[in-house]
Amino acid sequence: MKFFTTGLLATAALAAAQEQQVLQAEDGMGRAPLPDSSIFDETLQKFQSSLEDGISHFWSEMKTNFKDYLPLISLPKKHTRRPDSEWDHVVRGADIESVWVQGADGEKRREIDGKLHNYDLRVKAVDPGVKQYSGYLDDNDADKHLFYWFFESRNDPKNDPVVLWLNGGPGCSSLTGLFLELGPATIDKNLKVVSNPYSWNSNASVIFLDQPVNVGFSYSGSSVSDTVAAGKDVYALLTLFFKQFPEYATQDFHISGESYAGHYIPVFAAEILSHKNTNINLKSALIGNGLTDPLTQYPQYRPMACGEGGYPAVLDQGTCRSMDNSLERCLSLIETCYSSESAWVCVPAAMYCNSAILAPYQQTGMNPYDVRTKCEDMASLCYPQLNAITEWLNQKPVMQALGVEVESYESCNSGINRDFLFHGDWMKPYHRLVPSVLEKIPVLIYAGDADFICNWLGNKAWTEALEWPGHKKFAETKLEDLKIVDNKNKGKKIGQVKSSGNFTFMRIFGAGHMVPLNQPEASLEFLNRWLRGEWH
């Protein structure tokens, strides 16, 4: 779903460490201590001596305030694996890996690249009324099982493109994106399924993937705690899926997502593009309200919260000045993280910056995903409709129809969010992969302009600052009006757009963090035009 601030900001507030321990005890997450908590002390002592004073002091604070918190791990989800006989198809990665062909140079090579022998794909037809499949990608060596749900295009599935959708968090299920934003249906307060006329599968087939493991209906006996580790799983999923359904493999493929997918997508796209012989016809990448380059994006939080992003100020002048005063240290920590990419410096950067720069907004009670509204229900990430979606997905008949193997569904897993944070993933410079991606495919960065947490000012700033061969021309290109051209509202302004070479940025008017939720017509409009090749 979205950039998962709840657990992060609670963790970031060092002054409220004791309260945080109480909150974590009450959140229902199963946790178990490491065999020997003294390991943390010993490891910390070894590394502290080599760290600069500010960072060393931070880890001393962490040791005091989070002594019992840091060494905790999430327990695996309870699950029951269904026998292969209950699935309509089982695709073996080992079978794909064993196929060799003769190349144009006369040399033998594998038909499809990549380490696939440890993966299987299980497939189940869900509903004959709407062609859809669900199932699991299994990494048998690592005991990882990723849940996916595929919906065929409503229009022309034999020719329409295929889109992969990824929610962020990290730790939020893509099924919230399915039912809250852009899927073929939503769930009302009476748990009734309601059709969505603006679904992204209007002119494309769409795959929703719960990743990393232990998110949504996915599960594992282990965990994934950084973005890079998840990339190979996504490559395997797509390879095995298109092998089972070659009719979709010939179509254009696009990878899309929002929020922390600003981390995921550069890595996943680079992983796919690194393989020469593949059945994935990757044509573009789309990131909505993403976090991609923290060093460039964090300076834009104060302007967005203080009335310079097109909406009234949420914070008072004193708080805005305090954020300005904290920014220099925040950026210094991020720069150190960018230089080393070590958790020992990237974690302090995330903890300090989120406490000093993000927490003041969070403490107002306003919705961090939409500066225009109060947060109605923090437990449901400010969107009470999530409660109905979660309740519907937890119904036994629904889980049975989908082939689900876990006992329950939750929209976001705070343990995953914490794991990524404490492995230093949050502040890492994944934007550095974007230039190599731009060499091969177009990239669209779009942003609802009412979002605070991954705001349009920050996304515009990092796209204009990115160093790539087309940097100067893109940075100098002015924003132009983005208008509807595809329906009866032709001529209606829905935002602004700038594009040069393979790079495009869009500001979408009147949308928060989740553009398809707030502006469904505009969302489908720009998606359809992007998939047709406009702006690239």
Swiss-Prot record:
Signal sequence segment: 1-17
Covalent S-S links between cysteines: C172-C412, C306-C320, C330-C353, C337-C346, C375-C382
Example GO BP: proteolysis
Stored Gene3D superfamilies: 1.10.287.410, alpha/beta hydrolase
Catalyses which reaction(s): Release of a C-terminal amino acid with broad specificity
Glycosylation sites: N203, N502
Glycoprotein recorded as keyword: yes
Family: Belongs to the peptidase S10 family.
Protein name, UniProt field: Carboxypeptidase Y homolog A
Organism, as annotated: Trichophyton rubrum
